[in-house]
Amino acid sequence: MIYYMLLILPVVLAQDQQHTTESLSTKHHQQQQLSHSNAIMGEAGVSNSQLMQPSTPARTLRPLTAGAGGDPSLYDAPDDCHFMPAAGLDQPEIALTCNLRTVNSEFDTTNFSVIPAEHTIALHILCNDEIMAKSRLEAQSFAHLVRLQQLSIQYCKLGRLGRQVLDGLEQLRNLTLRTHNILWPALNFEIEADAFSVTRRLERLDLSSNNIWSLPDNIFCTLSELSALNMSENRLQDVNELGFRDRSKEPTNGSTESTSTTESAKKSSSSSTSCSLDLEYLDVSHNDFVVLPANGFGTLRRLRVLSVNNNGISMIADKALSGLKNLQILNLSSNKIVALPTELFAEQAKIIQEVYLQNNSISVLNPQLFSNLDQLQALDLSMNQITSTWIDKNTFVGLIRLVLLNLSHNKLTKLEPEIFSDLYTLQILNLRHNQLENIAADTFAPMNNLHTLLLSHNKLKYLDAYALNGLYVLSLLSLDNNALIGVHPDAFRNCSALQDLNLNGNQLKTVPLALRNMRHLRTVDLGENMITVMEDSAFKGLGNLYGLRLIGNYLENITMHTFRDLPNLQILNLARNRIAVVEPGAFEMTSSIQAVRLDGNELNDINGLFSNMPSLLWLNISDNRLESFDYGHVPSTLQWLDLHKNRLSSLSNRFGLDSELKLQTLDVSFNQLQRIGPSSIPNSIELLFLNDNLITTVDPDTFMHKTNLTRVDLYANQITTLDIKSLRILPVWEHRALPEFYIGGNPFTCDCNIDWLQKINHITSRQYPRIMDLETIYCKLLNNRERAYIPLIEAEPKHFLCTYKTHCFAVCHCCEFDACDCEMTCPTNCTCFHDQTWSTNIVECSGAAYSEMPRRVPMDTSELYIDGNNFVELAGHSFLGRKNLAVLYANNSNVAHIYNTTFSGLKRLLILHLEDNHIISLEGNEFHNLENLRELYLQSNKIASIANGSFQMLRKLEVLRLDGNRLMHFEVWQLSANPYLVEISLADNQWSCECGYLARFRNYLGQSSEKIIDASRVSCIYNNATSVLREKNGTKCTLRDGVAHYMHTNEIEGLLPLLLVATCAFVAFFGLIFGLFCYRHELKIWAHSTNCLMNFCYKSPRFVDQLDKERPNDAYFAYSLQDEHFVNQILAQTLENDIGYRLCLHYRDVNINAYITDALIEAAESAKQFVLVLSKNFLYNEWSRFEYKSALHELVKRRKRVVFILYGDLPQRDIDMDMRHYLRTSTCIEWDDKKFWQKLRLALPLPNGRGNNNKRVVSGCLSGRTPSVNMYATSHEYQAGNGGVIPPPSARYADCGSNNYATINECAAAGGGRGYKPIPTSASAAAAACKFNTMNQLSKKQQRDLSVAGMAKTLEHQHHHNHQANRRSQHEYAVPSYLPSAAPAYDSVDYAKQQIRNNANCECVNLGTAKRAAGKNPASGLPSSFSSNFVPPGGASYNCKKSCSCIGDDELLCSCGGGGGIGVNLLESGTQSSVTMSSSSNNSRQPELTHYESNLSLNDDEDEDHDQQKNLWA
C-alpha cells in the first residue's frame, strides 16, 4: 500500500493545479451544482449544525489507465465517498463507498449522477442510522452505472422500492437493501411489482431487516439466475407470499366449484403460475410465520439451504418440504413446534445432511421421522420437551452417516441399548441437562467412532463396568454435575483413548480407582466433590496427565508422595479446600509443574514449599492465614504471585532479590501492610496491587528503579501525607505511556507538604506517574470550622497548612532578643499553622484554660481562636499590632466586659465571634474601629441595653446576631443605616410591648422581613405574657399608665362560637366533596349495579339517544387479529352469553372483502358503542395501516365516543401522537383492573332485551359478506382449495385416526388445513360435525337447482334491485321484506308456540338451557345469509346422535331430521353457526364456518327462480 501511494503521489501533485472540479453527468447539471459540484448529498434547507455531518474524506484521485499521451486518467470520487480497488491494485475496477445522512429526504437532496460510471463496479451506500427521516430512491437513480455489478444500500429509511429505481442495472449481480426499518416500526418497506424486471441477471438478493409485511405476486419470477435470497428480519406472516408455492400438486375438482367463488377462483388462477427458480440459499428467519404449509417451497427444486428459524411456527404440513429435492440443510430452530409430520423428509431422505430443531417445544417424536435419512450428518434436537417415551430403536435407524447428535436440555430419563444401533459413525453425542438416572450396559457399544460424550447435568448415581463398552476412541467424557457416589474400577477399561475426564460436581469421597493406568489421560477434573484424603497411589499410571483439578473438596493435608506419579503435571488446582499442612517437597516431585492454586485454604507458612521449583510461573496463595512472607520463599522464575487476603504485615527481602526476581504481577491487597519501600517491590514488577491495606508510609524512591511499571493500586489505605519523592520514577520514554497510579480512598491531610499532588498530572517532566483517580481524592483541612474535608482539586493555597512552634524570617535581626515583633513564636498550649507563603498564620488556642489574653501572639496572625477559655474581660488594646487579623473567635469565654479600645488596630477584621459570653451592655464605641467587619455574633449573651449608634460605623456589616439576649428598648430600626445587612437575628429577647415602641418595631419587621431570619419568633413580653409580634390579631401593647390595650378590636372574641360552627361546617362540606371525588369510580359502579337507579337514569331523555334506539347492536369491537382468542373467548363469551349484549366483532362479523374503512365505519354505525381493544399487536399491525387510522378519525368525528380496552403491555415509544390524543380524550379500561367488568358495563349501554342473551343482530356486519376466503384467516385455510369437496364427517375422522404422529393429515387438509382434529366424541363436537355436513349439502343442492349464471348476490344487493320502492319506508336494519310469504318476520316469530318435531332416525339432545323449537310450516325457512346467524331465544344448540338414512338425490339435503323437517334443520344449522362460533371453546372452527355460510346466498333473479327457492328452503 505504501508503494502504491508513493507511485501515485507525483501524478496527483502534478495534476492537482490543473484539475477542475466537474461532475461526470451533463454540463447543464454541472452549472447547477455550485457548492456541491462533486458531492452526492446536498442539503435541503438544513444547516450542518442541525444534523450531524457524516465523516467525509477528501476527494481522492486515482490513476487508472494511460491515455494516448501516456498520462493516466483519474478516477474522481465524490466528496461523500471513498473507494478501494475492487479486484487488485493493478486493476481499474473500483468499489465505491458513500457515507450519507439520508437519501432524498426532507434534509438532503441526493444526486447519484456524479458517481463515475466507467470503472465503478461496486457501490455501497451507508446512511446515518441515528436520523429517523424517511428516505426515497428516485426513478433511474443509477441508470448511468451500466457496469455496476454490486449495489448495497443500508440504514437508509426507505419506504418504497419503485419499479424504475433499478433501471439501467442490467449487469447487476449482487443487490443488498437493508433499511433497518425494524428499528422504526411505523415505517414499512413496500416493493412494487416488476421492481426487479430489469435486473434479470441478479444472483444474490438481500432484503433483510426491512420491516416488509407483504410482497407482490411473483415478484422474484423474473430473477432466473438468482441463487441466494435473504428475507430475514421482516414481518412476513404467510409463506405463500414468497411466491414459491407449487400449486400444480394441489387437488382441484372443477365440478364442485360454486358459482359464488368465481371471483376467488380468478384471483387464485392469476397467481397460480409457479416460478421456476434456481435458488440454492433461502433465509426467511426472524419473521412472523405461524404455519409451514404444504408445497410452500415446492418450486425451489435446487434449494440446498433453508433457514426458517426464529419464527412463530407451531404447525407444519405433511408436505411442507415437498419439491425440495436437493435440500441439504434445514434450520427450524427457535420456533413453537410441538410435533413434526411423519413424512416431512420423505423427498429428502437421500439428500438431507443437517437438521436443526433446537429451542422448540417438541414433545412428540415420530419413530419414523428420521429413519433411513442415510445422508444426515448433524441432528440438533436440544432444548425441547422430548421424553424417553418417544425415543426407541426406530427413532435413529438408518442414520448411517450421522456425525453429530444433540439431545441436550430435554426430559430423557433412560436410554435403551438398541437406540443407537445404527449410529456407528457418530462422533459427538450431547445428552447434557436431561434426567438420566442410569446407563444400561452396552448402550453406546455400536458407536465405535464416538470421541465426545457429554452426560453432565443429569441424575446419574453410579457408573458400572459395562456402561461405556465399545467406546474405544472416546477422548472426552463429561460426567460432571451428576449425583455419582462411585465409579466401578473397570468403568473405563474400554476407554483406552480417553484424554479429558470431567467428574466435578458429584459426591465422590475418594479418587476413583478407575483412573489408574489411564495412560492417555491429559486432564482430570475432580472438583466440587467430597474427597477428604488422597492415597499415595491414587494417580498411579497417569504419566501423561497435564492438568489436575481438585478445587472445592475437603482435603486437609498433602503428603510428599501424593503427586509422585505425575511427572508431566503442569497445572494443579487445590483451591477452596481445608489444607493446613503441606509437606516440604510435595510439589518438587513434579518437575514440570507451572501453575499451582492453593487459595482458599488454611496455610500459615509456605517456607520451603516452592523455592526449588524452577518451572513454576504462576502461584496463587491468596485467602490463607500467612503472617510473613519473604521473596526467598518463591523461585526467581515466578512471574505471577497472588498473596491477597492474608495477614501479612510486611514484604521482606532478606536476601536482596529485588533485582534477580522476574515477578511481573504481584497482588498483596487486603493484608495488613503498614509500610512499603524500594526493597519491598521487585524491580521487574509491572502490575502491583497494594490496595486495602494499612499503609501509612511510602518511602522515597520506592518506585524509582521499576522500569516496567504500568499500574499501581494504593487506594483504600491509611496514607495521610505523601512526599513527592515517594512517587518519583526514572524518566519514561516518549513512546511509552506513563505508569497509572490509583491513590484515592486515603485520609490525606491538607498540609503544606501535599500541595504538589494537586498539580502532579500537569508536570511536564516524565518522572512522575499519572494519578488516575485525582478527582476522587479528598483531604482533611487542618483548621477549618466550616468543613472538615475538601476535594483535593478544589483546595486553595490557604488550605495547605503546616504547624510551627518558632519561626524567624531571614530578614529579621532581633530574634535573639525577647521583644521581637518579626519572630513567630506559638503561645503555650496553642497550635499554630502557616501556609507556604506565610500569608495565612493561624493561632489555635481554643480551650487552653487561659484567664487572660495569651502573650506573644504572633504579630502576623491572620486567624485567632481563643474561644473556650475563662476571660472575664477583654482589656483595651488586647490585640494591638495584629493588623492582619481577619478572624477572631472569642466566644464561650465568660467575657463580661469589652471596651472602646479592645479592638483597636483591627482594621482588617472580617469576622468577630462574641456569642455565649456574659456581656451586659454595649456603650456605643466598642466596634467603631472595625470598619471592614462583615459578621458580628453577639447571641446568647446578657445584653440588656445597646447604645444608639453602636453599629453605625459598621457600614460593611452583613450578619448581625442579637438573639438570646435581654434587650427591651433597642431601636432596631436604626439598623436600616447598615446597607449591606442581609441576615439579622432578634428573637428570644424581652422586647417591650409599649404601644409607641411596638408600633415602630412592627413597622420595621414588616419592612425587613426578608433580612430577619427569626421574625416569626420575635415577641414582646408584658406581665410575664409573651405575644408574637408577627401575629395579626390579639397582640397587646401597653400605654404609659400601664393600661393594657389591644392593637386590634376585641370584639372578635364574641364571635368565637359562630366562627367555630362555621369552621366545622366548612370542614364537613369540603370533606364530603373530597370523599365524593376520591370514591367517584366506586359510586359510579354502585349506581350502575343498582337496577332502579339505572332504569331511572336510562329512561330519562338525557341518557337515551333516539338514534341509539334504532341501532341493532349494543357494541362494535375492533381489535387485532392476533388478539382474536381473547376477544371471542373471554370478552364476547361473557358479554353475549352471561350479560346479554348484542355484539358485532370485526374479524367474526364484518365483511372483510369490502374496503376496510367503509366496512369499519358501517359496522361501528350499527352499534351504540364503539370499543377498541388496544394491544401491542394492534399497534404493530392494524394501527400501522392507513385505512384503520382514517376510519377511526371519521368515527371520532361522528360519534365522539370511544372506549379503549388496554390489553397487555403497551410500549410507550410506539404510541403515536394520534393514539395518545384518543387515549387522553376517551374512556380507558385496563384488562388487569380488578374491577374491569364493572367498569366495562358502566361504559357500555344497557343491553337490548336481557332475555335474548345469545341473540345477535348482525345486519350491519354480515349482510355484505362474499364467499371469498377470509384474508385474515391464520392457519385454517392453507390446505383448503377453492371449492373443494368436503367429505362426510365419518370419512374425514376415519382418516384422522390412521396416523397418530401426523401433524396435518389428509383429512385435515381437505377440511381446511386445521391441524389436530380429534374424533368427535363429545356432544358439542358431534353437533358441529352434523352442522357442517348439513350446510355443505345445502350448498351443493343450491348449485344444482339454481340455473341462473353469474355471481351470487347478498340480501342487501338483491333487495336493492327487486324492492326499491319499499326501501324508503323500511329501516336499514329491519328484516328484508322480500322473504317468502310463509317466512316469519324477524321480530314476530313466537317460538313458544312452535311445535317440536322429532324424527325416529335422529335423537336430539338439548345442549343449552332452553328447549328445542322448530317452525310449524316446513316451508317457512329463512335465507341462508340471514338464518346462518339467527339465534332463537334461549340460545339452544342441538346434537344429532343417531345416523340419518337418505334416499336418492334428497340425500344432499338430508340432515339430522326427516320428512318435512328440513327447514327446521336448516334453522338449527344457522343457530349452531351462531352459538357454536361465539361460545364454543374451540375457536379455530370459526374460519371454516365463515367460509361455508358465505355460500348460502340468494340468486339475482328472484322472480325467475321463485319456485326453486321454495324448494330450496322447504
Swiss-Prot record:
Q: Which residues lie on this side of the membrane: Cytoplasmic?
A: 1079-1514
Q: Which residues cross the membrane?
A: 1058-1078
Q: What is this protein called?
A: Toll-like receptor 6
Query: Can you tell me which family this protein belongs to?
Result: Belongs to the Toll-like receptor family.
Q: Which GO terms describe its cellular component?
A: plasma membrane
Where in this chain does the record put each TIR domain? 1111-1244
Alphabetical list of InterPro entries matching this protein? Leu-rich_rpt, Leu-rich_rpt_typical-subtyp, LRR_dom_sf, TIR_dom, Toll_tir_struct_dom_sf
User: Key word Glycoprotein present in the record?
Assistant: yes
Stretches of Low complexity bias are at: 255-273, 1473-1484
Ordered alphabetically, the record's keywords are: Cell membrane, Developmental protein, Disulfide bond, Glycoprotein, Leucine-rich repeat, Membrane, NAD, Receptor, Repeat, Signal, Transmembrane, Transmembrane helix
What is the annotated signal peptide range for this record? Answer: 1-14
- Where is it located? Cell membrane
Stretches for region Disordered: 242-273, 1473-1514
On the Extracellular side, which residues? Answer: 15-1057
- Mind listing the GO biological process terms from this record? axis elongation; convergent extension; dendrite guidance; regulation of synaptic plasticity; signal transduction
Write down the glycosylated positions: 111, 174, 230, 253, 331, 359, 406, 494, 557, 620, 708, 829, 891, 900, 948, 1024, 1033
Query: What residue spans do the LRR repeats cover?
Result: 145-168, 170-191, 199-222, 224-246, 276-299, 300-323, 324-347, 349-372, 374-398, 399-422, 424-446, 448-470, 471-494, 495-518, 519-541, 543-565, 566-589, 591-612, 614-635, 636-658, 660-682, 683-705, 707-729, 858-881, 883-905, 906-929, 930-953, 955-977
Q: Name one GO molecular function term.
A: heparin binding
The record's listing under PANTHER family reads: IG(IMMUNOGLOBULIN) AND LRR(LEUCINE RICH REPEAT) DOMAINS, LEUCINE RICH REPEAT CONTAINING 53
What happens in the null mutant?
Viable. Dorsomedial or dorsolateral mistargeting of VA1d ORN axons. No effect on the immune response to septic injury using a mixture of Gram-positive and Gram-negative bacteria; adult flies are able induce expression of antibacterial peptide genes (Drs, AttA, DptA and Mtk) and mount a proper innate immune response.
Traced from the root, the source organism's taxonomic lineage reads:
Eukaryota, Metazoa, Ecdysozoa, Arthropoda, Hexapoda
**Known Gene3D superfamilies for this protein?**
Ribonuclease Inhibitor, Toll/interleukin-1 receptor homology (TIR) domain
